[in-house]
Amino acid sequence: MVEILDYTKALEVLKEYPSGDGLHVDTLLDSDNHGALTYNDFLILPGSITFSAADVSLDTKVTRRFTIKAPLLSSPMDTVTEHNMAIHMALLGGLGVIHNNCPPDDQAEMVRKVKRYENGFILDPVVLSPSTTVAEAKELKTKWNFGGFPVTGKTHYLSSFGKLASSDSFSLLEKGTLHSKLLGIVTSRDIQFHKTPEDPVTAVMSTELVTAPAGTTLAEANEVLRSSKKGKLPIVDKDGLLVSLLSRSDLMKNIHYPLASKLPSKQLLCAAAISTHDADKVRLQKLVDAGLDIVVVDSSQGNSMYQIAMIKWIKSTFPDIDIIAGNIVTREQAAALIAAGADGLRIGMGSGSACITQEVMAVGRPQAASVRSVSAFAARFGVPTIADGGVQNLGHIVKGLALGASAVMMGSLLAGTTESPGEYYVSNEGQLVKAFRGMGSIAVMEDKGKSGGGKNAGASRYFSENDKVKVAQGVAGSVVDRGSITQYVPYLVAGIQHSLQDIGVQDLEALHNGVNNGQVRFEMRSASAQTEGNVHGLHSHEKKLYSS
């Protein structure tokens, strides 16, 4: 008969056990005994809750230098990330990587749109000259999706009515540029219903301006903007020359998007992909000129002489640009890219939902094994890792993070959102879906229109651009509409916070430390256990993942 012990001694008796319940991560991922695992093959055991989910911090590094507040990235696929996705991912605390299956100028323009979207002091505002027409101002508003353009030039005389004087007393010495005399501001209301589009903006611009002097701090400028009730606050030097601009809309964005991934300058963080081809050196120059912060060297097999050479060239040519290299799945691959100078690593080969590399090439690795092996090695050099692929749900994101990844990259999970560039259509079943295709699919590799007739990013990524016969490593299909990421990403963030609360850790560093020292434990899942862990035994059900 079992002896009944004093219940007050339960915590002391627990110490008699040689180890905690469940498995250490190294035991879990011992491929000699278990084979290589992926996310569905295990669970994380719960810990002790001593804090609220809202107190969980998800701050994480994506490269050696850059930190974001939500460990989520959107994939550089042509049906996932263009400027709209990149903007909203950054606003929500993550990072969007703009795809490169387009002409370099188009990709640079997307980067430029991200960098212009939200700013503190706008150091390179769009500035109009006095000769700009109302029609041209409307075109600029449509192009940049904002209104309120400063008008600058050099004048000898302004009339008492605030309008430019007649041509005989007005001398335009300089086009509208920064560091020129501020003459006025053209707002959306000034041009919206103006009936003569050929009129110069000087005929409609506002000249009664509230300005702040150069040297004003951001906090002081924000206060002036609030009290003035104006949409824009020009910053001028002692001579009245425009030096920068502040926008009221950006103040509102700061309120609505407190987690936004921003630089000290308040510009949104922006990443974009390039291939390993020499031709993309010109592409990268255009991206850097547009304001790029992070470059992702995109290849299905990252440990190549081409990628190593590209990393070294980028490091020597653009030392201020951080590099995320990949894709890789082994320590050996990681070592080569770290030695070349990579600031971050992207992990995954054949695990993406639209990828068939493992099936066709017989090369790759299950994602859980890949993430743990590479992340544990890279951590010794302070290099963050990004788990890319194999993510089918929120739980998979948490598992990728628990195995050592600093962040998780998503393709299909985001392809169905409003902000992705894929096309909506109604499926044969009457369901609203969005087009989604792997970058190794024949649909991408033979798409000359998307790349503008230049190098095809899909073919380049899979080393197939010179092949007479294209071997597909991906498929094209569709994903169900998910609505906007402004609702979906906050759901993911809240879910990760609740998961870490269940595990008993308050931030990602504590999660990684707990996994490494054995305090965070794991359990294998049999096929029956996986069935048990999903919805079962019901006649019917509705699976609604979140409400807002």
Swiss-Prot record:
Entry binding sites for NAD(+): D298, S299, S300, G348, M349, G350
Binding site for K(+): G350, G352, C355, S528
Organism: Penicillium brevicompactum
Region (Disordered): 527-548
Lineage summary: Eukaryota, Fungi, Dikarya, Ascomycota, Pezizomycotina
PROSITE patterns reported for this sequence: CBS, IMP_DH_GMP_RED
GO cellular component: a single term: cytoplasm
Any one Gene Ontology molecular-function term assigned to this protein's record: metal ion binding
Self-association and partners: Homotetramer.
UniProt-listed InterPro entries: Aldolase_TIM (IPR013785), CBS_dom (IPR000644), CBS_dom_sf (IPR046342), IMP_DH (IPR005990), IMP_DH/GMP_Rdtase_CS (IPR015875), IMP_DH_GMPRt (IPR001093)
Domain called CBS: residue spans: 121-201, 205-261
Cofactor(s) the record lists: K(+)
GO terms of biological process kind: GMP biosynthetic process; GTP biosynthetic process; self-resistance to endogenously produced metabolite
Residue numbers annotated as active site: C355, R461
Composition bias type Basic and acidic residues, residue spans: 539-548
Protein family: Belongs to the IMPDH/GMPR family.
Localization: Cytoplasm
UniProt EC number: 1.1.1.205
Residues at which IMP binds: S353, D388, G389, G390, G411, S412, Q473
Protein name, entry field: Inosine-5'-monophosphate dehydrogenase
